[in-house]
Every structure is written in structure tokens, then in C-alpha cells.
Amino acid sequence: MKFVIITGLSGAGKSQTVKSMEDFGFYCVDNLPPALIPKFAELCHQSQGVISRAALVIDIRGGMFFDDLFESLKELEHLGHQYEILFLDADDEVLMKRFKETRRSHPLNVDGSIENGITRERELLQELKDRASHIIHTTKLIPAQLKEELRNIYVEGNQMNNLMISIASFGFKHGIPLDSDLVFDVRFLPNPFYIEELKDFTGNDVKVRNYVMNSPISVEFSNKLHDIVSFLIPHYVQEGKNQLVISIGCTGGRHRSVTIAHVLYHQLKDKGHRVTLSHRDSGETRERKKES
């Protein structure tokens, strides 16, 4: 079991960090009293692998409970769990500006001075900062850049595998799926609907797929579609996107769109991407899924 203790200056980006860590598959808890860390670790252990990575935000909002942190970390280590400390920092001027923009008061703002609150907080957190495994300065980082910094630290292996690609076929006469990121119209391809022996089948049947893909236009389009999607994927990942919904439509959503969606699904699956396939309007309930 791996724990990441997220801490740092108020206004330095801890809330944004939690959102990113959740996207990376961490179970996140904000403002957990430090004394409860060992108990939380025990609960995670009882989950039998359901929770394998957790990120806990611990900061001076805990007040008097914050003093229990180092003792709790020592106990966590004694229980055989790994942990590391992620410390978020930023220039005082930037922190003050962020507080003013959000119109929030500093947690240690007892005399009306944000600056004094930041100074006091730095003093209280110095030992924790000295023990940090990673320190990220967010002064010049926008949220997407912060997420990329976190990705470089906490995401192992092929970053493309963090993007879930959902491919869905549909029929335009039933409406475009509202959650689509990319929509492709394949109504220009040969239509099996007008072939008597094929009209009652769908693109999930080999003979329908063979009919559609027997056209050079279909082959060329499917290859170009794969090329454009392959080009876009790393750029979406770089922007921090975690899910990509590709909708492919024909008139009724039973033949051409199902066929092209099927082809694209297998092209991306063979490249090792996490991809799911569904057919909204095919009249069938089957759905193929693959995560790798």
C-alpha cells in the first residue's frame, strides 16, 4: 500500500492536486486528522487490494491535530506501508494574490493580515518541507501544467494508458450522443441497408463488415480516421484529458457506423490503448470492452 501525503502552503494548489491524483487512480481524502492515518491505512488494507494507492491532504487546517502527523507517519511505516510527502509551495506574493482573488481568508489569519498568516504557516510547515520527497512550486503553473508535473511523478509506464477511449456507434436520426468529443459521419460509405440479404443484420456480423470494408473508400477512410485519432491522443494526454469519447454515426446506427467503430476499436486496442466499444442504436445489447 502506497500513501502520498499532500501538504504545503494554503493557496499553493492542494485542491487542484487532489483532483489530478483522483484522475491518476489514487483514493483521495482531504483534511484527514493525522491521528486517523493508521486507522485509515488499516481500512485500506482490509479492502483486499481495492484501494492500493491513497493520497491524503494534511495541512494546518487540522489545527491542534496537525501535531500528531509525524507520530502517525512513524506508525504508518511501522505497519509496513510506504509513504512519501508531496509539498506544494508558491511565492508569498502569488499566494496573497490568490487569496484576494478568491476572497477567502487565510487559515492562520488571526490579525487580519494574510501576509502574517503565510509567514506563520511557513514556520509551522518547515520541518515537513524538509522531509518532503517532492516539492512543486506552483507560482508560474496553470492547472494543466501542475497536472503534468504530478503525472511525471506519479504515473508509471505508458502515459497513453491513462486515457480511456470510448468508441460509440450511433444513428443520426436518433441524435448525436451528448458526451461526444469527436463525431465522425460515415453516411457516405456503401450502405448494406439496401442489400436485401444484409439489411436485417448489423455491423457486428462479419458479412456486413465485409460488404462495407470491401469498398476502397471505406478502407481509405478507416485508415485516415485511425491516423487522425492516433495524432490527437498524445495531445489530449498532454492537456490532461482522461477520457476521449469518439462517436461514429450513420443514418440508422446499425451497419456502417458499427463497422467503422469495430475497425477503429481493434486498431487502437492492438496499439495497447485502453478502449471500450458500444453500439447505441444497433438494436443489440452487446458491448465489447478492453482495458490494458
UniProtKB/Swiss-Prot annotation:
One of its GO terms (molecular function) is GTP binding. It comes from the Bacteria. InterPro entries: P-loop_NTPase (IPR027417), RapZ-like (IPR005337), RapZ-like_N (IPR053930), RapZ_C (IPR053931). ATP binds at G8, L9, S10, G11, A12, G13, K14, S15. SUPFAM superfamilies: P-loop containing nucleoside triphosphate hydrolases. The keyword GTP-binding applies. The keyword Cell inner membrane does not apply. Transmembrane segments: none annotated. Keywords: ATP-binding, GTP-binding, Nucleotide-binding. GTP binds at D59, I60, R61, G62. PANTHER family: RNASE ADAPTER PROTEIN RAPZ. Belongs to the RapZ-like family. Displays ATPase and GTPase activities. HAMAP family: RapZ_like. This is Nucleotide-binding protein Amet_4092.
